[in-house]
Design a protein with these regions (language model features):
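Extended accessory regions or peripheral subdomains of proteins
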Residues: 1-34, 39-67, 101, 105-205
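Donor-binding/catalytic cores of nucleotide-activated saccharide
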Residues: 61-96, 102-108
Length: 205
C-alpha cells in the first residue's frame, strides 16, 4: 500500500489492488456501525463508486416521533467540514447512515401508524473520520482519514495518521475471516404485536 502525496487533510492512502469493497467490508465487519454503500451496478455514471466506513467518532439516532431530527444533526455536521481531494471518489468522510421512511413525519404532518412493528429510528447517522472508497472504473481503492473530531491542525493530522494505521492493520491482520454468523431465526414463531382482529382492522380487511 502506498501513500498518495497530500499537502493537507484528508490523509489519503491508495489501497492494494487485492482489496475490493466486499473484502474490505468483511474485514471491518466487527467494528462498530460498519456501513457499506455498494454500487452493485458497475456503471460510469450510475454505479462508479462503492464506500465502506466503520467506527464513527460520533453516532446519532432520533426516534420516529415527528421531532425535527435533521435540525438536531445539522450543527454537529457543520463542525466537521473538509476540502474534497479532486479526481478521487467524492465521499471522503462525514455523515452517512439511515434515513427511514418515518422521517417524513419531521417534514410534514402525517398520521402515525397504529402499530410500529419494527421500531426503527427516524434516522441513524454516523460521523465517519475514516472512509474506504472504490472506483470501479479505474479499479483503484483509497483510504481517507480526516483526523476528526480533532480540529487543531496538528492534532488532527496526528489523529488522521493514527487512525489510518489502525485501519490498515485491521485490513492486514484479519485475512479473510468473517465475524461470527448471525443466529438462526425461528420463522415459525409468531411475531405480531397485535391481535388478528386488530391486524385486519388496521389493514382495512
Amino acid at each position: 500500500m502506498k501513500d498518495r502525496e497530500n499537502k493537507s487533510l484528508p490523509l489519503v492512502v491508495e489501497l492494494s489492488p487485492a482489496l475490493d469493497a466486499v473484502t474490505v467490508f468483511q474485514k471491518l465487519s466487527a467494528l462498530p456501525h460498519v456501513l457499506f454503500l455498494d454500487s452493485a451496478l458497475k456503471d460510469d455514471h450510475l454505479g462508479r463508486y462503492s464506500f465502506v466506513a466503520a467506527d464513527p467518532f460520533a453516532y446519532f439516532t432520533a426516534p420516529a416521533d415527528g421531532s425535527d431530527a435533521l435540525s438536531q444533526l445539522a450543527p454537529q455536521m457543520a463542525k466537521f467540514v473538509s476540502e474534497t481531494v479532486p479526481d478521487l471518489p467524492p465521499f471522503q468522510g462525514g455523515a452517512a447512515g439511515l434515513l427511514s421512511y418515518d422521517l417524513g413525519r419531521s417534514l410534514e404532518r402525517v398520521p402515525r401508524p397504529r402499530y410500529d412493528e419494527f421500531e426503527l429510528p427516524a434516522l441513524a447517522i454516523g460521523l465517519y473520520d475514516v472512509v474506504l472508497a472504490f472506483d470501479h472504473v479505474s479499479g483503484s481503492g483509497y483510504l481517507f482519514s480526516q483526523g476528526w473530531p480533532e480540529t487543531d491542525p496538528a492534532l488532527r493530522a496526528e489523529r488522521a495518521a493514527r487512525r489510518a494505521n489502525q485501519f490498515l492493520r485491521q485490513l492486514d491482520s484479519f485475512g479473510n475471516r468473517h465475524g461470527p454468523p448471525a443466529g438462526a431465526v425461528d420463522f415459525a414463531r409468531r411475531t405480531c404485536r397485535g391481535s388478528h382482529g386488530n391486524y385486519l382492522l388496521n389493514k382495512g380487511g
